[in-house]
Structures are given as structure tokens and as C-alpha cells.
Amino acid sequence: AMPGGCTHFSVMLTNYLAGYLRRKAILLEVNGSGDLEKLEHVCTGQVGQKNPFRILDADYYKHVGPEDVKEVLQRGYDDIVIDFGSVKDGENGLYWRCDKKFLVGSFTEWQQESFREFEMEQRAKQKKSWQSLAVFGSEETRREFSRRFRINAERIPFSADAFSVTKECGEFFQRIL
């Protein structure tokens, strides 16, 4: 994903799966952002060595390495959401093994170029196996982007609180999953 929006989307998706669909879900942070540590501090008041930690109905796992992934796979989760961070963090082989892949991008003027570049690069390698989603930008910009570059991206509904699933978000997740 592009910077800005990926972690928020991942938390929203994990909460939809765990809180709304009542599935056993976990979010893994496979990037160096440290966002989940900040989330843990804000939501629980502490930052511990505890991995995974829980907020509401979902589990969160910070600073995930290859060994942690193996461990999580043995824990019987219905859904494992992985936040790979920015495409600039380099390619992660684990990404291509996921059942569902989402590229979270932005239609803000200063970010749409890297969104387009990644799409074109992967398309050239014939690796287009993900759904493109957009966090920021108007519907008009999304349509123009789609028309100009033939990249169809669905707009993620705005949600100020990643932990509460609005009706619009519920319908959105139902559509993309």
C-alpha cells in the first residue's frame, strides 16, 4: 500500500471480521511502521512485550517476522489480515501467497503517481492479482484515474473510527471479500 491509509484499512477490516462477522481474526504488522505499538499504547494504555495483544474482539501482532507467521498459522484463526506497509518497503514473498490481496492507494495528487507506477509495474510482470482500493480523493478523481490509466479502484468509505463498522463499511467489506 501507499503511505497513509493501509493500517487504518487493515484495522477496519480486522474489526469487521472479528466484531461484525464474529470470526477469529488477527492483524499482523509485517512492516517497520510501529503503528500497532502506537495503537496498543493508545487503546490499552501500555506497550508490552505481549504478542498478540487484544482490542475488543480482534488480536493484533506487532513486528512480525517469518517465525511469528508460522506460529500464528497454528493458532486456528479464521482470518489473518497482514499489513505489509508501503510498496516502497520492498517486495514480500508472503504477499503473493495470500488468498485475498488489496492494494490500498491514494488519489491525492501527490500520491497517485506511485499508485499508478506500482500497478503498471506489476501488470507488466503479469502479477495483477489484487483489488485496488483508494483511501483519499474524490469520486470524480477516482473515475478520472480509472478512465485514464484503466485501473479500477474501489473507494474505501470514510470511517473516523476504525473500530466501529458503519453500515456503509459493512456493505463495502461484503462486496470486496
Predicted feature descriptions by range:
Residues 167-177:
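Histidine-centered active-site loop/cap adjacent to the catalytic His
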Residues 74-168:
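Conserved catalytic-core segment of NTP-binding enzymes
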Residues 9, 13:
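Hydrophobic positions on the alpha1 helix immediately C-terminal to the Walker A/P-loop
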